[in-house]
Amino acid sequence: AQIYEKVKEKEKMSDDIKTLNEIKNIGKKMEASISEYFSRIGINDPTTNFDWEYILIEKKQKNAWCMPGGKIAIYTGILDVTKNTDGLASVMGHEIAHAVAKHSVERQSRGLLLNVGTKIIDVASGGVLSQINSSTGMNTVGLLSQIGIMNPFTRTQESEADYLGMIFASLSGYDIRETKKLWQRMKNANKGKETPQF
């Protein structure tokens, strides 16, 4: 938390209240969805003691991050790439998933994520991920398969964060099909260099 406070002192905070409120609204929806998600799959919510906070930093850099405990920063530079609420929710879901995964690894071992992956398969036919996302008219499993992602738990932590982030975003009512477009925009904005990891 000390590092986060130092970042807030050092960096210039954006005065774009509208975007900051949008970030906070997305965050609140995701907080609720994460709690509901873990409750439904029968695993203790690793975010119970998080003190969620959202800041918008005035910086051209295309970046976002989340510190342990739910301290989330979005840089104004990434807004050129997110383009819309669904794109912003994709970035935030990814960052929040990192915080959830890191906390899970510290508290209960990496097995929690693998267990969640197994539970996802278990509930795919009628559980929490089969709820209909009101913005798309599709369930999360359908959206994930449409994007071409079904089992990320054999890949890197980045892939796991992408996957869990999309689950959290979809359960919060956002269209995760935007994620694929977002990554293409990131690639284009980076002019063929390696896509930055936020």
Model-flagged regions — what are they?
Residues 1-198:
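A Zn2+-metalloprotease active-site environment signal
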